[in-house]
UniProtKB/Swiss-Prot annotation:
Belongs to the palC family. Residues 449-488 are annotated as: Disordered. Residues 2-430 form the BRO1 domain. GO terms for biological process: cellular response to pH. This is pH-response regulator protein palC. The keyword rRNA-binding does not apply. It comes from the Eukaryota. InterPro entries: BRO1_dom (IPR004328), BRO1_sf (IPR038499), pH-resp_palC (IPR037505).
Length: 488
C-alpha cells in the first residue's frame, strides 16, 4: 500500500574541526555546533537502522532541519575560501537506493556537495516514511476482501482518518518537491565531480543516488504516492455506503466522479511508468561494464576502514523496481475500471458495449496481478529482503488486488447481463477505444531550503558597508522563509 517505505541512508561520524582548516579562527564554535548537529543526524539514522526504541522518521526530520543550515554555511565559507579542507575530503554514506550483491557498504563520497546531496535525499525519504507511519497508525477503513469482518469506525476515528490522510498527502508533496529541487540544484553541483573522480580513481561508477534521473524519478514516485493517498481520502466519505451495498451499479449520489477517478489513476500510471523509464536511463548493460579492477567507486588511502564495493553498477534496488511494476499495473487496471463505469453509468445506455470492454480489460489486468506467474516474476525482484517483510508486503498487495477484483467482477457481471438482455451492443477491443489523458490534482510542493546558519565574514562585512539587509548575506538565523516550521 503506498507510500513506499524507504530504507534511509546511514553515515559515519565526522568532526568538522578535524577535516577543515579555519585560518582566521573565526568559526571554532560554529564548527563545533555543526559537528554536534551532524552527530544528531547520524544517531537518528543509526537508531532507525538498528530498530532502536523511539527511533522514527520524525527524529530524522528534526535532525536534518537542524543540520542543513550549518551545512549550507560551511559550503558558503568553503566557496569564499574562509574554510579550507586539510586534505582530500570524503564523506561516508550508505546508498539506500543502489543495489549491491551483498550488504550495502559505506561509500567514501568525494566533495561537500556529495554530503549535501545525501542529506537532502535523507530529508525527502524521511518525509515519505513519516507519511507512511501516519497512514499505518490510522484505523482500518478499506473493505477487506472476502467474507471478513467489516471495519467499524466511530466519529472520532473518521475525523482522525480524514486528518491523517490529508497530512500524508501534504508530506508526500513536500517530499516530491525536495527531490525535484535536488535534481535541479544539488545534482548539478555533483555532476562535474563524477567525471573528475572517475578519471582519477579508475572509472568507477557513482551510486544511483548521484544521478539527476534518480531524483526526478523519485519526485514522480512520491507525487504518484500522494495522488493515491488523495484518492483514498476522496473515497472515504462513501465508505458507509460501500460497507452495506454490494459492489456494482448504481453508484451512490455522493460518489466521486467516475471520469475524475479514471483520469487520476491514468496520471498515477503515467508517473510510475515515467519513473521506471528514468531509472533505467543511466544504467549500462552488463556487457559494457568495466572490469572488476576498474569498478572501484572511490579509493582513498586515508579511508582504510571503509568497505569499498568491488562494483557499484548504479542500479536501483529490486524492491523499488517491484513496487513500481506492481503499482503501475494496478493504477492502469483501476483507470480502465472507472472508464468503464463512466461509459456505463453516464452513457445513457448507448455505451454498454464500451463499458463492458473497459471493465473486462480491468478484470484481466487484475487477474494478471493475482496470477501465480506474475507473482513469481515480481517476487524474483525482491531477493535480499527479509522473509517476513516479503510476506507482509505480499499479503497487503493481494488484499488490495483481491478487493478490487471482487468489485470489478461485479461490474462485469452487471454490464454483461445488461448487454445480453437489453443493449445487445458489440464489445469493441480496448485498443480501438480512446484513452483520455491523465489529470493531476496537485503538483510537488516547492521546496525553499532553510537559510544558512552563518555566512562568510567578509560577505557580512561587505553587507554592512553597503547597508544591504538582504537575508542572503550575513547572519540569517532569524530569517523567515516559505515553509518555515512545516518540515514535519
Amino acid at each position: 500500500m503506498p507510500p513506499y517505505l524507504y530504507r534511509l541512508p546511514t553515515t559515519s561520524l565526522i568532526t568538522f574541526s578535524a577535516i577543515l582548516n579555519d585560518p582566521s579562527s573565526s568559526y571554532t564554535t560554529i564548527l563545533s555546533d555543526a559537528t554536534a548537529s551532524r552527530t544528531k543526524l547520524h544517531l537518528a539514522l543509526k537508531g532507525i537502522a538498528d530498530n532502536e526504541p523511539g527511533a522514527s522518521a520524525l527524529a530524522v526530520l528534526d535532525a536534518v532541519q537542524i543540520y542543513l543550515p550549518y551545512l549550507k554555511g560551511i559550503i558558503a565559507c568553503l566557496d569564499a575560501d574562509e574554510l579550507l579542507f586539510k586534505g582530500e575530503p570524503t564523506f561516508q554514506w550508505r546508498a539506500p537506493l543502489t543495489h549491491f550483491s551483498f550488504s550495502s557498504p559505506l561509500l567514501p563520497l568525494a566533495s561537500i556537495h556529495s554530503e549535501h546531496l545525501m542529506v537532502v535525499l535523507t530529508y525527502a525519504l524521511a518525509l515519505s516514511n513519516y507519511a507512511h507511519s501516519i497512514l499505518a497508525s490510522l484505523p482500518a477503513f478499506e473493505i477487506p476482501a472476502g467474507p471478513k469482518a467489516m471495519p467499524h469506525m466511530s466519529s472520532e476515528d473518521e475525523k482522525r482518518t480524514t486528518a491523517g490522510l490529508a497530512r500524508a498527502v501534504d508530506l508526500l508533496c513536500q517530499a516530491s518537491g525536495v527531490a525535484e529541487w535536488a535534481a535541479e540544484n544539488v545534482c548539478l553541483q555533483v555532476e562535474p565531480l563524477k567525471g573528475v573522480s572517475s578519471g582519477r580513481l579508475g572509472k568507477g561508477k557513482w551510486p544511483a543516488e548521484s544521478s539527476r534521473e534518480t531524483f526526478k524519478a523519485l519526485s514522480m514516485i512520491l507525487l504518484a504516492d500522494a495522488h493515491l493517498t488523495a484518492i483514498r481520502k476522496l473515497l472515504f466519505p462513501v465508505l458507509t455506503y460501500t460497507l452495506f451495498a454490494p459492489p456494482g451499479p448504481p453508484l451512490p449520489p455522493n460518489h466521486p466522479s467516475a471520469p475524475l477517478q479514471a483520469k487520476l489513476y491514468l496520471y498515477v500510471h503515467q508517473l510510475y511508468s515515467s519513473a521506471r523509464a528514468l531509472l533505467s536511463v543511466h544504467h549500462q548493460p552488463t556487457s559494457s561494464a568495466p572490469s572488476n579492477s576498474s569498478r572501484k567507486l572511490f579509493r582513498s588511502n586515508t579511508d582504510k576502514d571503509v568497505i569499498e564495493p568491488e562494483a557499484v553498477e548504479g542500479e536501483i534496488i529490486p524492491e523499488l523496481k517491484r513496487y513500481l511494476a506492481k503499482e503501475a499495473q494496478l493504477a492502469l487496471a483501476l483507470a480502465h475500471k472507472w472508464l468503464g463505469i463512466d461509459a456505463g453509468e453516464n452513457g445513457k445506455g448507448a455505451k454498454v458495449g464500451e463499458a463492458l470492454a473497459w471493465v473486462k480489460d480491468a478484470q484481466g489486468r487484475l487477474e494478471d496481478l493475482e496470477d501465480s506467474k506474475m507473482r513469481a516474476k515480481l517476487k524474483g525482484l525482491s531477493i535480499g529482503k527479509s522473509r517476513e517483510r516479503k510476506k507482509e508486503e505480499r499479503r497487503a498487495r493481494m488484499g488490495r488486488v483481491e478487493r478490487e477484483l471482487e468489485v470489478v467482477k461485479a461490474w462485469v457481471k452487471a454490464y454483461q447481463k445488461m448487454n445480453d438482455t437489453v443493449a445487445f451492443q458489440p464489445v469493441p477491443p480496448v485498443s480501438s477505444l480512446v484513452t483520455p489523458s491523465g489529470r493531476p490534482i496537485f503538483g510537488p510542493k516547492a521546496f525553499i531550503p532553510p537559510p544558512s546558519k552563518f555566512s562568510p565574514s567578509r560577505i557580512g562585512h561587505l553587507n554592512e558597508e553597503q547597508g544591504n539587509d538582504s537575508p542572503e548575506l550575513g547572519e540569517t538565523e532569524d530569517t523567515s522563509y516559505a515553509g518555515k516550521g512545516n518540515y514535519f
